Regions:
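Hydrophobic beta-strand positions that form the internal "hydrophobic ladder"
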Residues: 66, 143-146, 193-196, 263, ...
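Serine-hydrolase catalytic core recognition
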Residues: 410-737
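Residue-level detector of Asp-centered blade-edge/turn motifs that repeat once per structural unit
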Residues: 61-62, 141-142, 191-192, 258-259, ...
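Short loop/turn segments that connect beta-strands within beta-propeller blades
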Residues: 114-118, 168-172, 235-239, 285-289, ...
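A flexible loop/linker signature enriched in serine peptidases of the S9 family
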Residues: 70-110, 127-134, 149-165, 179-185, ...
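A short helix->beta-strand "capping" segment at the edge of beta-propeller domains
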Residues: 32-52, 241-243
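Blade/loop signatures of beta-propeller domains
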Residues: 29-41, 107, 225-234
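Conserved beta-strand position repeated across blades of beta-propeller domains
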Residues: 58, 138, 188, 255, ...
Length: 737
């Protein structure tokens, strides 16, 4: 059994965190020649490509099977005749996969295994002409059938179109049951298993997401091409599709009542990309008239004007649990747990003052919830026992020093019907992705009350991949009455007698948290560490993980309190580790990009910055972006009502103070942090005589999708930091203490 490298199990002696295994070939490499630099970067990129990614996992309700998706190896990694291989590792319970079958573009495998990861079978889709992608793995209530989405039967020019397929739990041949023409997501079985439901945007497969590239802004803006996402149902065996929610409400997520007679969903008027921040909670009978159960814009109390997510019906259908709080990004959830009567009424906060951020939940009994929370920079799974509308009692089950997911929602796990087994995808800075499973102790009501078997890997697909960077440690510090946490990555082959440069990597959001994870191919903190830097990843005020007071402390104060937290973290690291304060770098993406623009106008400590999808002027940004509704909860009013609140946090208003050489990168069709924001900052730095470079990537959105662009950003960033943070030698000998 491969145990998770960073787990703390409640009421147990088992407490151990990342071991920091390093590659034997790892070397400190900052002041390298261009040829050596390019070689080192290529080596890092190849190591990241060596990893096969899990994108979804689902436990059968009876707890006897687990399904997952995993990326195929790239063509360069294939051997033999290229045939797909997927079989149980002889003499062990964990599964291994082989390379893709078609020798073309890497795709994914869909596999079904026994609960312990043994006896793996790879699902086949007949007449598939290319590599495939899979998502939304959903078991039928009787555990006999797995439904899922795939783009297998569409040509290479239409790989964004997904359809619904089904495969028997004991089989490998899947059957296509739909021929859809539009975006589909959040597949689910209706209670009883007679129908399938999903979110559907008819006639348009363009992702409705703030991070995706925007469409060309042509035609009547606000009217032409507005997507309408509705809940649709069809017979489980295939048949006619029916949309059961009105076109006037864009549905973001939903849940069925246990009897299948009502829906609860989060929705707002189209366009959906912009209006999630003002969404309401609705209930509705299938095909009936929607009823507003909760409108955060008008409710009294702490929830007023905030965001809501993850609605879940109680087993008896009398209440709906959800998460409410200050959230900057759809799909990145954190806040408090609330209960509200299904027919409406006053919502009750059952986790008031809790010093963690619940992120996902599900009912496990009439008065019990299983809640996955961001705790510091880790993930904690707990049972919350409810006491009416009073504060719930938390019973922690285990904490994982990483983020977890099952391919549906942030921090979600997949759970058996009796709540005694769960599975999730996990990785750390030290361990590549695998599927993990845990066995839970339940009481007579099937409510989890303890851990029988802590999380352990049931796959070993990436067991041979080792990091090329140093160990990671959690760092805590106090600042202005707040407890702040961050992660520190070490350079490879760390020598405590040398002094190293430090790069601060600021996460996006601000309502988010950086938790350990194996890096994707492309730009991020880990490749920086692999090149010989210390990398600090702080979770300053405004982040999830320390409770709602901490998260909301950034309101009307962006760039100030959070920057002071970050600088205090740098001081903490410098006091404990051999960091050269004269070689500090700063970087981040999205909100981290904003901080990388704003911080150099407030402090001269940073000698170089790499700005990803940044934001330089909140005033002009308000009229440029496609998601302006997100700002009012943070600034208290629109820019037209209170422009000074926006000017206060705008780098452009303080640009004469900026002396930091800055590389700026952005996507051409970024709707969340539009390219003009980067142009403004670049133009201003040039006017001030500050070294700068701006790169705009064709066709990219807020989150880059093209591998060549991801690589290019990383290469440019490493060269930029190498130029401004390097010295004549890779590291300096530390002064004697």
């Amino acid at each position: 059994m491969k145990s998770h490298p960073g787990i703390a199990v409640a009421c147990s002696a088992l407490v151990f965190f990342g071991a920091g295994v390093m590659s034997q070939a790892a070397v400190a490499a900052i002041a390298l020649s261009p040829k050596q630099d390019a070689s080192r970067i290529a080596e890092i990129m190849q190591r990241l490509r060596d990893v096969q990614r899990f994108n979804a996992v689902s436990v059968a309700p009876n707890g006897k099977a687990v399904a997952w998706t995993v990326t195929e190896k790239t063509p360069a990694e294939k051997g033999g005749n290229g045939a797909t291989v997927a079989a149980a590792d002889k003499g062990a319970k964990a599964a291994k996969t082989g390379p893709a079958a078609d020798g073309g573009k890497p795709g994914e495998l869909l596999q079904i295994a026994a609960a312990d990861g043994a006896r793996v079978r790879t699902v086949r889709i007949l007449r598939s002409a290319k590599s495939c992608q899979y998502s939304n793995l959903r078991w039928s209530p009787d555990s006999r059938t797995l439904a899922f989405l795939s783009n297998c039967n569409h040509g290479s020019g239409s790989d964004k179109q997904f359809d619904i397929y089904e495969v028997a739990a004991t089989g490998i041949a899947a059957r296509r049951i739909t021929h859809l023409r539009g975006l589909v997501n959040q597949l689910a079985w209706t209670p009883g298993g007679s129908q399938l439901s999903f979110l559907y945007v008819e006639g348009d497969v363009h992702p409705v997401s703030a991070v995706s590239a925007t469409k060309a802004l042509v035609g009547v803006i606000g009217e032409t091409g507005v997507e309408r996402q509705r809940i649709a149902v069809l017979p489980a065996s295939g048949g006619e599709l029916h949309e059961i929610t009105p076109a006037s409400i864009f549905v973001y997520e939903y849940d069925w009542a246990s009897k299948g007679d009502r829906l609860a969903y989060i929705g707002a008027p189209p366009p959906g990309r912009d209006n999630w921040w003002i969404a309401k909670l609705y209930t509705q009978a299938p095909g009936g008239t929607p009823q507003v159960t909760l409108d955060p814009s008008s409710v009294d109390g702490a929830l007023r004007g905030l965001q809501i997510a993850v609605p879940r019906w109680s087993p008896d259908g009398s209440r709906i649990a959800f998460i409410g709080g200050l959230m900057s990004d759809q799909g990145v959830t954190g806040g408090d747990v609330y209960l509200i009567p299904a027919d409406g009424g006053k919502p009750a906060d059952v986790t008031p003052g809790i010093a963690i951020s619940p992120s996902w939940l599900t009912w496990t009994g009439d008065d019990a919830l299983l809640v996955s929370s961001i705790a510091g920079g880790s993930t904690r799974l707990s049972t919350f026992v409810l006491h009416g509308n009073q504060a719930a009692t938390a019973q922690p089950l285990f904490t994982v020093a990483a983020g977890v997911e099952n391919g549906t929602f942030s921090s979600a796990v997949s759970l058996s019907a009796r709540h005694d087994m769960l599975a999730f995808i996990d990785s750390t800075f030290d361990s590549p992705p695998e599927v993990y499973s845990a066995l839970l102790k339940t009481n007579s009501s099937a409510e989890p009350v303890g851990v029988v078997e802590p999380p352990h890997a049931i796959t070993r697909i990436n067991e041979r991949v080792q990091p090329m960077w140093g160990k990671s440690v959690s760092v805590q510090w106090q600042n202005e009455g707040f407890q702040v946490q961050g992660w520190l990555l070490f350079p490879p082959a760390f020598d405590p007698h040398k002094r190293y440069p430090l790069i601060v990597f600021v996460h996006g959001g601000p309502s988010s948290a950086l938790r350990p994870a194996w890096p994707h191919v492309g730009y991020g903190p880990v490749p920086l560490a692999a090149m010989g830097y210390f990398v600090l990843m702080p979770n300053p005020r405004g982040s999830f993980g320390e409770g709602e007071i901490f998260t909301q402390a950034v309101r009307l104060n962006m760039g100030y309190g959070d920057l002071r937290d970050i600088l205090a973290g740098v001081d903490k690291v410098e006091a404990e580790y051999p960091v050269d304060d004269s070689r500090l770098g700063l970087t981040g993406w999205s909100y981290g990009g904003f901080m990388s623009m704003f911080a150099p106008t407030q402090t001269q400590r940073f000698k170089a910055a790499v700005v990803g999808a940044g934001l330089s002027d909140w005033k002009s940004y308000y009229g440029e972006n496609s998601i302006d509704e997100w700002m009012i909860p943070f600034f208290g009013a629109s820019v037209y009502e209170n422009p000074m609140a926006y000017a206060k946090s705008s780098a452009i208003d303080f640009i004469k103070n900026d002396r930091t050489p800055s590389l700026i990168v952005v996507g051409e069709f970024d709707g969340e942090c539009p390219a003009p924001q980067s142009f403004e900052y670049w133009h201003a730095l040039r006017a001030m005589g500050v070294p700068t470079s701006l790169v705009v990537y064709a066709g990219e959105g807020h989150g880059f999708e093209k591998p060549k662009d991801e690589r290019d950003v990383l290469e440019r960033a490493l060269r930029w930091f190498g130029k401004y943070l390097a010295t004549d030698s890779a590291v300096q000998t530390a002064e004697a203490h």
